[in-house]
Structure formats: C-alpha cells, structure tokens
Curated annotation (Swiss-Prot):
Species of origin: Clostridium acetobutylicum (strain ATCC 824 / DSM 792 / JCM 1419 / IAM 19013 / LMG 5710 / NBRC 13948 / NRRL B-527 / VKM B-1787 / 2291 / W)
Chief place of localization: cytoplasm
Keyword line: Cytoplasm, Protein biosynthesis
Domain of life: Bacteria
Designated gene of the protein: frr
GO biological process: translational termination
HAMAP family: RRF
Family: Belongs to the RRF family.
PANTHER family hit by this protein: MITOCHONDRIAL RIBOSOME RECYCLING FACTOR PSEUDO 1, RIBOSOME RECYCLING FACTOR
GO molecular function list: ribosomal large subunit binding
Protein name: Ribosome-recycling factor
Subcellular location: Cytoplasm
Described purpose of this protein according to its UniProt entry: Responsible for the release of ribosomes from messenger RNA at the termination of protein biosynthesis. May increase the efficiency of translation by recycling ribosomes from one round of translation to another.
Amino acid sequence: MISDIIKELEEKMTKSISALKKELTSMKAGRANPAMLDRIEVDYYGTMTPLNQLANISVPESRVLMIQPWDKSAMKSIEKAILISDLGLNPSNDGTTMRLVIPELTEETRKNIVKNVKKAGEDGKVALRAIRRDANDKVKSLKKDNSITEDEMKSAENDIQKKTDSYVKEIDKMVEAKEKEIMSI
C-alpha cells in the first residue's frame, strides 16, 4: 500500500521534472537549439501541427537554425507561426529553406530570461509540493481506515518528504545550470 503510494509519487515527480527540463531547454540562451521550436505549432491545412513534425530542423552554425519543410507549401504557415511565437525571431525564407538567426542576448534580455527560468523552477517546485500533499493525504487516509499504524504513517511521510527534497534539489540544480548558461554567453 505505502510502497504503491511512494512509487506513484516518484512517477509523478519524474514527469514533473521532465516537463520542466523540456521547458528550460526551449528557453533561448543565445545559442541555436532545435528544442527552442518544440512549442511552436503550425496551422497546417486547418490542423495545429508541431513544427518538428513538418520540417527538418538543424543547426548549421552556433547561432543559426535551419528549417527545411518536407512540404514546401507549408513554408508561409511555418513563417507565420514563428513570427507570432514569443521567441522574437525573424525568419528569412528563400522558398525551400528558412533560416533563423538567434540574436546576441543583451544584458536586459538575459535578466528577463533568467527571471522566466526562476519562475519555471518555482512552478516546478509548486507542482512537486502538490504531488507530495496528495501522497501524504493518501497515507493519512490509510491511517484513518486503520490500515496502517501511527509509526508506519510517520515513516511514510518521512520517506515522502525525503523524495520531495531530492527532487527539489534536482530542480534547483537545473535552474542554476540554465542561469549559468544564459549569463555566460
């Protein structure tokens, strides 16, 4: 019973960490990274489709992303999706390929990105706390039903807290690494 609760807790926390990792990867850091475009969806024949399913995205130079759509008729839609995204990138389109030059980050831009990184990290921690609360509630309900003893409940809550602390440390490390990456370019 308790082991199932802890296993579920770990699965949910791992998913939460993965989501944060993906979000941090998509935040631009002055270097070209295909993951920056992961959240861009293109209106492709009336259906919102992820950009990475419509085109090959490569990094020919450290600050350039090259997009080669498999269907050249989607070029205008891709360009429009990039322009309306919050990335602030201006695509140059030659009809068959599209190039995105990642601008140098100003000090102000870096600070704004770091602020967003910290906010994403804090949101990740809030999600972990909610998962911890759910797990603790399940343990308490087991105690209420007299399925476990008081000592087992305290032990389980202690285990849950230790797991939560380790995942929070992981978030702190991820946020710190991303901040360092942004500020060192």
